[in-house]
């Protein structure tokens, strides 16, 4: 005999979700570009450089983040602990195959504290995090971690940790005042037909680009926007490793 229920739950169909396409100039489908420009509600981020990159831009409405000119408004996009931890993981990736990644986890902690401290200052930019970590004495870190600074082993440990934090930060540029600050949050709050361009210098490591993409994914998730990675062969590279 079947079970009779006094009422039934009926799930409403989920509304269609907008889509964020992250592409390079040569992998961006023309029909996707046309649809976004016409205001279909989807969004586009283009990562690249050169003539094909600039030819896609509408100078009157599109936005650009150029790591070489330091105009990413990082702290506007990282107001929560989750967002900051996501950025830290992007700057200091950890390969699960690493047999001893303890110094990398320590480096993540140092970077997280630096971001938290610098973010309390008005008008803070990523260059402030770079400078703070660059000027942090190894013996101070060793002492904070509980090492005896008289022991050279503790100081060497701190030097190793700091090197792992400084490496992804050393190419962070000072903000060029001629370049308006650009925020992912503000871009997403604006018209969907506005495209975000991210300049990629082939001579620079992709650490900051990784953090930008991580932030794009996070804010897309919060906005219930599906993300489609369409970079093709133009994958982001960190220290020679494709990710």
Model-derived features: where do they sit?
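P-loop NTPase motor domains
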Residues: 2, 13-15, 21-23, 28-242
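Short hydrophobic short-linear motifs embedded
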Residues: 1, 5-7
């Amino acid at each position: 005999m079947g079970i009779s229920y006094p009422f039934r739950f009926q799930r409403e169909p989920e509304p269609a979700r907008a889509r964020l396409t992250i592409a390079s100039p040569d992998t961006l489908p023309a029909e996707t570009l046309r649809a976004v420009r016409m205001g279909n509600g989807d969004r586009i981020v283009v990562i690249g450089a050169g003539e094909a990159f600039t030819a896609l831009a509408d100078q009157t409405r599109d936005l650009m983040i150029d790591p070489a000119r330091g105009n990413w408004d990082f702290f506007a996009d990282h107001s929560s602990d989750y967002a900051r931890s996501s950025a830290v993981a992007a700057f200091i990736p950890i390969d699960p195959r690493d047999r001893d990644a303890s110094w990398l986890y320590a480096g993540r902690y140092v970077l997280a504290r630096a971001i938290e401290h610098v973010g309390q200052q008005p008008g803070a930019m990523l260059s402030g995090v770079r400078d703070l970590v660059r000027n942090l004495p190894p013996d101070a870190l060793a002492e904070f971690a509980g090492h005896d600074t008289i022991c050279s082993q503790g100081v060497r440990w701190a030097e190793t940790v700091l090197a792992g934090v400084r490496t992804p930060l050393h190419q962070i540029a000072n903000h060029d005042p001629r370049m308006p600050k650009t925020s992912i949050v503000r871009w997403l709050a604006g018209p969907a037909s506005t495209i975000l361009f991210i300049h990629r210098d082939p001579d620079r490591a992709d650490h900051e680009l990784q953090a930008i993409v991580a932030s794009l994914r996070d804010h897309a998730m919060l906005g219930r926007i599906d993300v489609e990675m369409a970079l093709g062969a133009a994958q982001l590279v960190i220290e020679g490793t494709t990710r």
